[in-house]
């Protein structure tokens, strides 16, 4: 399988999950502005939506959308720690959290990365984000991971998008549980391996 990614983008989430599962993916960097892959392919031909991540399966099919990809990867290995079994309430809870991160956090960052976004809109979006992080903070103040006592694909996704806060000057200092969570996730060997492969860190940090 091949993962099309952009360093530090939301594609980092499935990259982390693959490392957590021990799945050996080939990876290909994609320029999200020119829509060209590192090998020169037209990314529009791979994913007509035009954005990462895209997972090219061994049979040539392409799966898109991060939450779908991370669940697919976990299911391939039957890993019910990273993603509970289909049809269970626990799986529905996972999907509930993935949807929250997608719609309420991930997408809210989008206008903050655009140069032409008016300042008033930036401030409104930042205020919206901090309100959404208040919910996450309450969860993480009571437990180590989003869904309880073990790391799931939702944690990989939250970590990935929350890394963007510094780039858009979003102050998260009022969320100590969230910041502690980010540090915990960053120290996981699979996370460091994915970040190293994407050039986000220069070497793994010793535990």
Protein language model features and the residues they cover:
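Terminal-tail/helix-coil boundary detector
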Residues: 196-207
